[in-house]
Amino acid sequence: MRTAGIKVWLQVEPAKCDVPMLIDLMYLQYGHHPSVIGFGVDVEWFRKDLVRFGKPVTDAEAQAWVAQTRSYHAEDLVLVKHWLPEKMPPSYRDGLVFVDDSQGLGSLSAMVNEFSVWGQTFAPSPVGFQYGYASDKSSWGTMADPPRDIGNALISAIPNTRDLVWVDFTAYDIWPPE
């Protein structure tokens, strides 16, 4: 898959699970695939039993996750995803990609503005964006090629963009099964 340009994040919604244990489980099962580029944590679901919308990730937690991930592949990264910057590690940056999954933004310009703030907040670290939610379909539904059109707008506006992810919820709207 990697030779075809497909790259895969092993992402979890950890709830109460121990994240280092999940890193081990995921890498032992899937880490041998050459398309795997890292491990991801959807922070909205990190210790949601303790804090609504997930517990903020501490610097120590982020550093431990990166070390655990890199114990399998030295070049792999850790993706941390949320729409609130305050849920991200306050200062640790090495080996992290910060992904914003905001939705319900109403227009492409509002999306670019929202995501630009995220990019600036975490610059020069790499950032990514998850988009294509049904709540934004009124803005992307009329585009000729929504993943490309939105992606190009984000890359043009946010120089530290590394990852662009279309959500699975509307993937068949864009790429219908044959």
Task: Locate predicted features.
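Aromatic-lined carbohydrate-recognition surfaces of secreted/lumenal glycan-active proteins
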Residues: 4-20, 66-88, 101, 126-136
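Short, well-ordered coil/turn segments that N-cap beta-strands
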Residues: 4-8, 33-37, 74-78, 94-95, ...
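Alpha-helix N-cap and loop-to-helix initiation/capping positions
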Residues: 17-18, 53-61, 110, 146
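A general structural detector for well-ordered alpha-helical segments in enzyme core domains, enriched
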Residues: 22-29, 58-65, 69, 114-118, ...
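Substrate-binding cleft/loops of secretory-pathway carbohydrate-active enzymes
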Residues: 22-28, 84-111
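An active-site-proximal structural segment forming one wall of the substrate-binding cleft
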Residues: 1-4, 15-38, 68
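Substrate-binding cleft of secreted/luminal carbohydrate-active enzymes
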Residues: 103-178
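Active-site groove signature of glycoside hydrolases
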Residues: 27-56
